[in-house]
From Swiss-Prot:
Composition-biased stretches (Polar residues): 71-85, 430-454
InterPro entries associated with the record: Knr4/Smi1, Knr4/Smi1-like_dom, Knr4/Smi1-like_sf, KNR4/SMI1_regulator
Organism: Debaryomyces hansenii (strain ATCC 36239 / CBS 767 / BCRC 21394 / JCM 1990 / NBRC 0083 / IGC 2968) (Yeast)
Protein name as it appears in the record: KNR4/SMI1 homolog 2
PANTHER family according to UniProt: CELL WALL ASSEMBLY REGULATOR SMI1
GO CC annotation, single: mating projection tip
A GO BP annotation: fungal-type cell wall beta-glucan biosynthetic process
Compositionally biased residues, Low complexity: 217-226
Compositionally skewed regions (Basic and acidic residues) per UniProt: 470-481, 489-515
Biased composition (Basic residues): 554-568
Family: Belongs to the KNR4/SMI1 family.
């Protein structure tokens, strides 16, 4: 579209009352037939008048008045002119006694006719002006005939019901981005553009589901043509059939039965109300064998079982208006701080916040608790209210536990064959190779450290129990340090760690009394040797013979002590290494 076309459409939008039709719409002065093509020379308003006339005038062509000719009679008016009057119910009684009320035409169910769309809109507007004026300001103006004609052509579903055309000629839904609540108890009333957008989304969903259903049917046909001779192929086909039957596509139902076509979405369903959760209220232009053209249904994400909630738009809007006039509504004020209906207010100044009074959400409330009683816990959405009313109308008593969404059943898993245990995947996996042998011993998948089995250690970390470590004297300070480290260890050690530590009792456990005696003897010997050294130092010695002198006893003992200390350090390091290896193995096992 070029700049000129954009300018023309802008001028068209500000100079005309069209909401949906374009500036060059070819449907301004033409009607649309059932196929979606235009019929020239016809006017939409004349077609509406004709349909209204056919809806009110009885189709009988025979007169019950004697002397009637071709179902009509001649009557004289006050000015003396004669008029031909066709037969209507109540005509004879109206002529005989004009003071009584005339009889009314009844609908197909034997009920009196419903109010017209215009009268219903008048009642809605009066309620909005009194209770919720801001929501009334949120409504669009009515559409034109050109809008409706182009809308019908874009849908491609044939002619719309007369009630729909009258309904949208009064108001074209709600403003986009207006109040956060919908007109119909929280359900947003879509305009013509919104209907086209929702219809396009559901058309894509329907197209994808049709492809999936076609693939399922094609696979079933192939399996029927290729009837397998082996039992394995038969089990596969049976499992595939169960999978198809367990999907939501094959479990679409309706209440009453056969009133709605068993599809998840259909091109003949025109949504005009939505709850922004994937559920819609729509006009059904392609009903089932037991349905009626133009009936109002609920379909969507939570409704695998579709419901017929009204036979036409007039009946649906009449129920909504009745709820408003009976007081079965509530304007939620929880989001407004200091509002007129806020329960947290304790002051007496009710003028504060009155401007924010009508900013909440419009929702349903059973005022006198006659319809649902005390069974309602929390708020009921209007879709849930319509659902329960429809179920009650069609004789379903268990209203609260009835679910309209399909829940697939759990399919039994086939047991693995014996040959499957030897498969390369199972053989390579450590969980299938090592863990299967110990399944009967313990249910815990971790290694049971308290069992009698021992974990194999590497050769470098094995300790030979036959080797005897020579007893060596250990100092008292070293014994205390070893005892302190042993006491600081956690109590939750495994038996492997305890066994490794207990293999060295001879090195750690030495009697304290023997150590004290040995230390006293060593100290006495050292004192004697020191005295002898002082005596020897007084005698002159040559510097040349100093290097050739043999080592004294004290020097030898000092060297032996150093060697012993080095050996003890090496042994302690070995025990520490063994403990670290045991802890690492325990961590790996856990």
């Amino acid at each position: 579209m070029g700049i000129i076309d954009n300018f023309k459409s802008f001028v068209h939008s500000i100079t005309t009352e069209d909401h949906y039709a374009s500036y060059d719409s070819p449907y301004k002065n033409s009607a649309v037939n059932n196929v979606g093509t235009t019929v020239g020379g016809g006017n939409s308003s004349s077609r509406l008048h004709e349909l209204n006339r056919l809806a009110t005038v009885n189709s009988s062509s025979h007169s019950l008045i004697e002397g009637g000719n071709n179902g009509s009679r001649t009557s004289l008016s006050r000015n003396g002119s004669s008029t031909t009057v066709g037969y209507r119910p109540g005509l004879r009684s109206s002529n005989t006694n004009s003071s009584e009320l005339q009889l009314q035409n009844l609908n197909a169910s034997g009920q009196p006719p419903l109010p017209s769309i215009d009268s219903l809109w008048d009642r809605i507007e009066s309620w909005l002006e009194e209770e919720y004026p801001e929501l009334g300001d949120n409504l669009n103006d009515g559409v034109t005939t050109a809008d409706l004609n182009e809308f019908e052509n874009d849908l491609g579903c044939g002619s719309l019901p007369v009630e729909i055309r009258q309904f949208y000629k009064r108001h074209d839904g709600q403003f986009r981005g207006g109040k956060p609540t919908g007109l119909v108890m929280g359900l947003t009333l879509l305009d013509l553009e919104g209907i086209i957008e929702e219809y396009a989304i559901w058309a894509k969903v329907n197209q994808r589901l049709e492809k999936q259903q076609y693939m399922f049917q094609h696979q079933q046909q192939q399996q029927q043509h290729q009837k397998a001779t082996s039992s394995a192929d038969a089990s596969e086909t049976h499992g595939h059939e169960n999978k198809i039957n367990n999907s939501f596509i094959a479990n679409q139902k309706s209440i009453p039965p056969n009133a709605i076509q068993p599809y998840y979405a259909h091109r003949g369903w025109i949504p005009f109300l939505k709850d922004f959760c994937g559920n819609q209220i729509a006009i059904d232009l392609a009903p089932g064998p037991q349905g009626h053209w133009g009936q109002i249904i609920i379909f969507g994400r939570d409704y695998d079982t579709k419901l017929v909630i009204a036979s036409n738009l007039q009946e649906f809007m009449f129920g909504f208006v009745s709820d408003l006039e009976l007081g079965n509504f509530q304007i939620d004020q929880n989001d407004q701080d200091g509002g007129f209906l806020d329960g947290s207010r304790n002051d007496d100044d009710y003028m504060i916040g009155d401007g924010e009074e009508d900013q909440g959400e419009l929702c349903f409330r059973d005022r006198e608790q006659k319809e649902f009683g005390n069974s309602i816990k929390g708020k009921l959405t209007y879709l849930e209210v319509l659902k329960r009313r429809a179920l009650k109308t069609f004789g379903i008593t268990n209203l609260e536990k009835f679910s309209t969404s399909f829940t697939p059943q759990r399919m039994p898993h086939a047991k693995p064959n014996a040959s499957g245990m030897a498969s390369p995947v199972r053989a390579a996996s450590p969980s299938m190779s090592g863990a299967t042998a110990n399944t009967n011993k313990s249910q815990n998948p971790l290694i049971n450290m308290e069992s009698s089995s021992k974990v194999a250690l590497p050769k470098e970390t094995l300790i030979d129990e036959d080797e005897k470590v020579p007893e060596e004297p250990v100092k008292k300070s070293e014994v205390k340090s070893v005892k302190n480290t042993a006491a600081a260890e956690p109590e939750k050690e495994t038996k492997q760690k305890d066994e490794i530590i207990e293999e060295k009792p001879e090195v750690i456990e030495t009697p304290a009394k023997e150590d004290d005696k040995e230390e006293e003897e060593e100290e006495q010997e050292e004192e004697k040797e020191q005295e002898k050294e002082h005596e020897n130092e007084e005698a002159p010695e040559d510097e040349q013979n100093e290097d050739a002198k043999p080592l004294t006893k004290t020097q030898k003992k000092n060297q032996s002590k150093k060697a012993k200390k080095q050996q003890q350090k090496q042994k302690q390091n070995e025990t520490n290494d063994v403990e670290e290896v045991a802890e690492d193995l325990n961590d790996v096992a856990l």
